[in-house]
Regions:
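N-terminal accessory segments that position/regulate proteins before the catalytic core
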Residues: 1-171, 181-184, 203, 207-234
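C-terminal substrate/ligand-recognition segments
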Residues: 188
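Short, surface-exposed loop/helix-turn segments at secondary-structure junctions
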Residues: 172-176
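Structured binding elements
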Residues: 199
Length: 234
């Protein structure tokens, strides 16, 4: 296997090349604090504050015992508030577990509500203290192009967790990336098991195609990179 660092540098440089409104800036120099990421432009901030979750019907052991495989997703709508509450709780677990280190490299979950009840379909961002509507859903073909497999776009929702790799690099260099990737995977698997414990199904996958969400989720691959994802359905 060949390790071509020059090609990697060109890719990273391209991701951070800027746009018509924001000039490009260097990355991986340990100075993330001097170039804070611009705020995400949300269509409707604070559209929902999920309430406390009801008790799960199954504990972790029972959840593992009950798991089974399926080749298709159910077509019933997903209740939006419980789903968004599960995402928030998984994010809160990450914050409690890692404390100051989580604050240095915060995670940012996005939820594509494809077939919800109790909320409008759209792209949402989940925070510890609320939920923002980022924008409406794109066309179905666009969603299919974002995912690894087209059938993922037929789920009730897709949850992706993003991170600022520039901040992770400043925090710990290469270890910062591994730390952030591990936490992203833990959050997604935590959400997956919460969903399964409520009788839902889903598929964990490696995340959205970066080029497909560059504008849709304001993800340049450096200051915001979609790390890991999961589908959720009835």
């Amino acid at each position: 296997m060949r390790t071509d660092f020059e090609t990697l540098r060109e890719l990273v440089s391209g991701f951070s090349a800027g746009s018509a409104t924001r000039p490009g800036e260097p990355t991986s120099d340990g100075l993330a604090g001097s170039r804070p990421r611009p705020p995400l432009d949300c269509q409707a901030p604070d559209v929902l504050v999920p309430g406390p979750q009801e008790a799960y019907p199954y504990d972790l052991h029972q959840t593992f015992e009950r798991r089974s495989s399926s080749t298709s997703y159910g077509t019933e709508p997903l209740e939006a508030e419980p789903l968004l509450g599960m995402v928030r709780d998984a994010l809160a677990d990450d914050a409690r577990t890692w404390g100051e280190d989580a604050e240095a490299c915060p995670l940012e979950p996005f939820v594509l509500l494809l077939r919800p009840s109790g909320a409008e379909p759209g792209i949402y961002r989940v925070r510890l203290d609320g939920v923002d509507l980022v924008r409406p859903l794109p066309e179905a073909e666009v969603i299919e192009g974002m995912t690894v497999q087209k059938e993922f776009a037929r789920a009730g929702a897709i949850v992706s967790v993003a991170a600022n790799l520039d901040e992770a690099d400043t925090w710990g260099g290469a270890a910062g990336y591994r730390f952030t990737m591990s936490r992203s995977a833990a959050l997604i698997y935590s959400l997956h098991l919460r969903a399964v414990a409520r009788g839902l199904v889903g598929t964990v996958f490696a995340g959205f195609a970066t080029s497909a969400v560059r504008h849709l989720l304001d993800s340049d691959g450096v200051s915001r990179h979609q790390m890991f994802a999961v589908t959720i359905a009835s």
